[in-house]
From Swiss-Prot:
Belongs to the peptidase C69 family. Secernin subfamily. The modification Phosphothreonine is found at residue 52. It comes from Rattus norvegicus. InterPro entries: Peptidase_C69 (IPR005322). One of its GO terms (molecular function) is dipeptidase activity. The active site is at 12. Keywords: Phosphoprotein. Pfam families: Peptidase_C69 (PF03577). This is Secernin-2. Gene3D superfamilies: Penicillin V Acylase, Chain A. One of its GO terms (biological process) is proteolysis.
Length: 423
């Protein structure tokens, strides 16, 4: 039987700042991906492509119909699956997803994972709003479901999404095939493993209210509050913890209203006291991402990714979609083809070593050092990260105008330099 209990350890936090909340004329997106402790997250670049009409696309568990054209994407993903926990496309659309449990039951059948929906939306959407509709359409056609961890005991949940582009952001929250979405055209917003859309609904599934009424969750009279109607009546302890993280994240964003930068977002993601940077039981923050999406379309979007666990002990490295972008092998996990435990039925009966080169170096360096050596290592990490942030500032102000080829190879260069730090 699949475990669908929200008591199971699982948490994530997504943040977005839309001007005037940002210190600069840019939308700023951030996410911590909290996953099983030993799960490896890789960073994968997928180039744009054109596809044969009517062709099929294999996602984590099921096939879907492919579209004729897909955008280039950068993905931070658990290396055993097809989709992603967070990512961006070449047009400046960013998405992060999170687990959520509602009154709508979680089925045990295999369908699209929330992480598959995320990647499909990035590959197929030119704006955050378009991505909302892509996910809604896929939910309606294929549904969501399947185990979300590499374990013989299935662990299933529904999903919420934070979507952003150069001009605005959207929150999309689902319950089975049903959904509600909220548009954010200014200010700061966060999500943390719970329904957060109340009465301010910008778009919704056409049967959302009639279903709630038929189930006896809503009288059909008065104001319709999505979170109130669809949230579990008795909130388990784990959901209470999510509420605490949500409040803490909200407060941190509010304190920085008007002055939110990439550095502010990184600091929030590194906050351990709130549980946003988590290390609890069998789960921890396995990867993190911060993206700066300038409103000026002539300026490049810059995406910072760690590819390693615990942002407080990791380096945010800049990625830019430009000429000459390639896949750094140091952040790519090994592949196992038909022998992968996710491909053999019943699934996940054995384990394989998915650690990529940067992950191995990062973990080995931190594990072997005493406190003084770790302090020195952290200084080197911070110095490298600051170089990336300085490059961002130079690009945004126009003080730096590197050749496109140099921008395209930026992430590769930072990955190589970080790898050398751990050698």
């Amino acid at each position: 039987m699949a475990s669908s209990s929200p008591d199971a350890p699982c948490s994530c936090d997504c943040f977005v700042s839309v001007p005037p909340a940002s210190a600069i004329p840019a939308v700023i997106f951030a996410k911590n991906s909290d996953r099983p402790r030993d799960e490896v997250q890789e960073v994968v670049f997928i180039p744009a492509g054109t596809h044969t009409p009517g062709s099929r696309l294999q996602c984590t568990y099921i096939e879907v119909e492919q579209v004729w054209k897909t955008h280039a994407v950068i993905l931070s993903r658990p290396s055993w699956l097809w989709g992603a926990e967070m990512g961006a496309n070449e047009l400046g659309v960013c998405i992060g997803n999170e687990a959520v449990w509602t009154k709508e039951p979680v089925g045990e059948g295999e369908a699209l994972l929330g992480m598959d929906l995320l990647r499909l939306a990035l590959e197929r959407s030119s704006t955050a709003q378009a991505a909302v509709h892509v996910i809604a359409g896929l939910l309606d056609r294929y549904g969501q479901g399947g185990s979300c961890r590499e374990d013989p005991e299935p662990f299933c949940y529904h999903n919420t999404f934070l979507l952003a582009d150069r001009t605005e952001a959207w929150v999309l929250e689902t319950a089975g095939r049903l959904w509600a979405a909220q548009r954010i055209q200014g200010g700061a917003r966060n999500i943390s493993n719970q329904l957060s859309i109340g009465t301010d609904i910008s778009a919704e599934h056409p049967e959302l209210r009639s279903h709630a009424k038929a189930q006896g969750w809503w009288s059909g009279q008065g104001v319709f509050d999505f979170a109130e109607v669809f949230s579990l009546t008795q909130q388990p302890v784990r959901m209470e913890a999510a509420k605490a993280r949500f409040r803490a994240g909200c407060e941190m964003l509010q304190r920085q209203q008007g002055s939110i930068t990439a550095e502010v977002m990184m600091d929030i993601l590194r906050n351990k006291e709130s549980g946003i940077c988590m290390d609890s039981g069998g789960f921890r923050t396995t990867a993190s991402m911060v993206s700066v999406l300038p409103q000026d379309p002539t300026k490049p979007c810059v995406h910072f990714l760690t590819a390693t666990p615990d942002p407080s002990r990791s380096v945010f490295k800049p990625f830019i979609f430009e000429v000459g972008v390639s896949q750094p092998p140091q952040v790519l996990s090994p592949t196992f083809g038909a022998q992968d435990p996710v491909r053999i039925l019943p699934r996940f009966q054995t384990q394989v070593d998915r650690r990529h080169s940067l992950y191995r170096g990062h973990q080995a360096a931190l594990g072997l050092m005493d406190e003084q050596e770790q302090a020195q290592l952290r200084q080197e990490q911070q110095s490298l990260e600051q170089e990336g942030l300085e490059a961002l500032r130079g690009l945004l102000t126009g003080e730096q105008t590197p050749a496109p080829q140099e921008l395209g190879s930026l992430f590769q260069a930072f990955v190589e330099r970080e790898h050398q730090v751990y050698a």
